[in-house]
Amino acid sequence: MIKITQNIECSNAAPFVLFGGINVLESEDLALTACAEYVRVTEKLGIPYVFKASFDKANRSSIHSYRGPGMEEGLRIFEKVKAEFGVPIITDVHEIYQCAPVAEVVDVLQLPAFLARQTDLVVALAKTGKPVNIKKPQFLSPSQMQNIVQKFKEAGNDQLILCDRGTCMGYDNLVVDMLGFGVMKRTCDDLPIIFDVTHALQNRDPSGAASGGRREQVVDLARAGMGVGLAGLFLEAHPNPDQAKCDGPSALPLDKLEPFLAQIKALDDLVKSFPPLVIG
């Protein structure tokens, strides 16, 4: 079990935690608007909640794509979100120098999938002492995550969450191996596993400079993943996904957040009401 705040704990056996927000900080107003709706819905449904957003999308497909406001402005917006709503925050870092200042503001740091094997970045994240969400690289098998986990532990940090966002299947396509969740639990000491349903819905247009997506399938994929019994769900929503500056095709429309989460909570409650059944 990983303690995020005094009141929020993340465990595969506990009620799921929602790591939800927007993809990238487009503006302060959008961050506050989105967070307000997440807070309203999660408080109504009784779901533990962590706000998520990126201050820099450093791995965009095109050099011309919007990346975000940068670290300094991003941290200012995060402080405003915290002051207004009192929610914990998760965000990703891409450079070693970002780790310490970001850790002063946010509650959970995130290691991006494309950077998950970068040892110097792993060590810098570990040294913050903050919980770290490790995104499983699309090119890595679930069992190989234990090597990344071991790096963190040897660097002095065992406050780890593992996140699956799909695996490459051929070219320009991601699939989610539902059996992989159990493999990560067994090989990584039952660390909390969360499911990034938003980015698992990405697909690529080989001729395009941005990711496509399949948001019409978000309910199916989220139900399937959370039916395994996971510690959390990682989700992005937007008031107008077609106008989002990053990953709009995979984003849930914000006005569908309440009915969507009501279904996921009902499923999570049901799955975790079952007694353990070990077959070997």
UniProtKB/Swiss-Prot annotation:
Q: Name one GO molecular function term.
A: 3-deoxy-8-phosphooctulonate synthase activity
Q: Which domain of life is it from?
A: Bacteria
What's the main place this protein lives? cytoplasm
Q: Where in the cell is it found?
A: Cytoplasm
Q: Which reaction does it catalyse?
A: D-arabinose 5-phosphate + phosphoenolpyruvate + H2O = 3-deoxy-alpha-D-manno-2-octulosonate-8-phosphate + phosphate
Q: Which Pfam families match?
A: DAHP_synth_1
Any idea which UniProt keywords this protein has? Cytoplasm, Lipopolysaccharide biosynthesis, Transferase
The entry sums up its family as follows: Belongs to the KdsA family.
Please report the name of this protein according to its UniProt entry. Answer: 2-dehydro-3-deoxyphosphooctonate aldolase
This protein's encoding gene? kdsA
